[in-house]
């Protein structure tokens, strides 16, 4: 596990051939074994039998890329949170009970969860907008497992899943997007309306753990205002989790760091190829609209934009405390400044890694930071200062 958490996932690598607004994508295939009820209705002996059957297939077959199986009962809560921050397990897996585990490939582009929402959930993660490559990787594992396990399948409905929203293909494709131009030009809702007609849902991202009240602590000194005090969330809320069904999403106006999730709504009545086709078309349109919005923003509000970028870079390069939400917003302006040619010397791969490593569990595991909110905020600020050392504003 130490080797896993110290290795940077391949899906974080910057893609020179992919538009910057499209950061990463994943494809999930949910499957259930015909002999058992859904995991939440299983007793522990049944969950254990499902896990044993899956692990025996791993041992006796070579259809999976190199990796390891991790039993949840062998991991502490901090390690589980670290995996959730890496998008290798979902929030449902983090909160589930009973025997369960996850197989993770060494490059962390593939994870197979056992006994989360469904008996098996195959998760493939790719950089940029490689949605078809993500599906192809997941589909190869699905085909191999389907030959060895009797998956629940209905001739008319397709694959049967714990959630009705997954019945059919059992496939969810989601893409992480960075859309500051559309946000600042107030064009996001027009985009959302068009996407909903294509049966695609655009949502904001949520910082934190829904089980914990995320009221930030404002440690402002008397006489300070206008953003001169850090806003630091509780320690367990300094994270970004993902879930299977979109329950960890926010309204567009409430998102953090100009980040958004695009996901297919339909799993019934469309084939996998049709879902991928619609998603790819939408991503091309989104990238074009975002680039147009950035050009328009620079043309119409250039001085204001450059002032905001300068303020963000000054804060990110000097602050001694950074909350998670604040850090994501600063990272958005850093990314925007670099892609629009307003700063030099930035390593975009380092910025991508920072978005992973600045989360609470990663700071504790990788840097030994104490699990107190201010300690995490202090270390996060140090990471940003280190990132920006050697950079310059044009």
Model-based region annotation:
Residues 173-179:
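Short glycine-/aliphatic-rich beta-strand segments at the starts of folded cytosolic domains
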Residues 1-156, 163-164, 171, 183-185, ...:
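Long, Pro/Ser/Thr-rich low-complexity/intrinsically disordered regulatory tracts in eukaryotic proteins
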């Amino acid at each position: 596990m130490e080797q896993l958490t110290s290795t940077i996932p391949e899906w974080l690598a910057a893609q020179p051939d992919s538009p910057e607004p499209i950061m990463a994508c994943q494809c999930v295939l949910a499957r259930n074994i015909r002999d058992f009820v859904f995991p939440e209705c299983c007793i522990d002996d049944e969950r254990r039998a499902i896990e044993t059957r899956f692990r025996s297939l791993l041992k006796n077959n070579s259809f999976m890329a190199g990796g390891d199986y991790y039993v949840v009962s062998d991991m502490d809560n901090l390690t589980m949170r670290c995996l959730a921050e890496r998008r290798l397990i979902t929030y449902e897996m983090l909160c589930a009970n009973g025997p369960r585990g996850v197989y993770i490939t060494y490059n962390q582009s593939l994870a197979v969860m056992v006994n989360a929402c469904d008996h098996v959930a195959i998760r493939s993660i790719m950089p940029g907008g490689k949605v078809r490559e993500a599906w192809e990787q997941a589909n190869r594992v699905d085909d191999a497992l389907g030959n060895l396990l009797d998956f629940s399948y209905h001739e008319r409905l397709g694959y049967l899943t714990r959630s009705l929203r997954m019945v059919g293909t059992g496939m969810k494709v989601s893409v992480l997007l960075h859309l500051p131009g559309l946000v600042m030009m107030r064009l996001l809702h027009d985009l959302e309306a068009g996407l909903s007609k294509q049966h695609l849902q655009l949502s904001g991202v949520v910082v934190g753990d829904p089980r914990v009240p995320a009221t930030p602590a404002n440690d402002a000194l008397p006489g300070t205002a206008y953003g001169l005090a850090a806003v630091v969330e509780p320690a367990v809320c300094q994270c970004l989790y993902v879930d299977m069904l979109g329950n960890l999403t926010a309204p567009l106006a409430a998102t953090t760091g100009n980040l958004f999730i695009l996901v297919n709504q339909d799993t019934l009545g469309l084939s996998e190829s049709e879902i991928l086709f619609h998603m790819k078309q939408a991503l091309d349109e989104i990238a074009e609209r975002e680039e147009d919005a950035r050009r328009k923003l620079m043309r119409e509000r250039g001085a204001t934009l450059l002032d905001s970028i300068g303020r963000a870079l000054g804060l990110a390069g000097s602050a001694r405390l950074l909350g998670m939400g604040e850090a994501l917003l600063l990272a958005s302006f850093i990314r925007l400044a670099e892609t629009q040619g307003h700063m030099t010397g930035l390593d975009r791969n380092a910025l991508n890694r920072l978005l992973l490593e600045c989360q609470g569990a990663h700071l504790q595991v990788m840097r030994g930071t104490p699990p107190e909110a201010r300690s995490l905020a202090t270390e996060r600020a140090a990471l940003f200062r280190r990132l920006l050392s050697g950079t310059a504003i044009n």
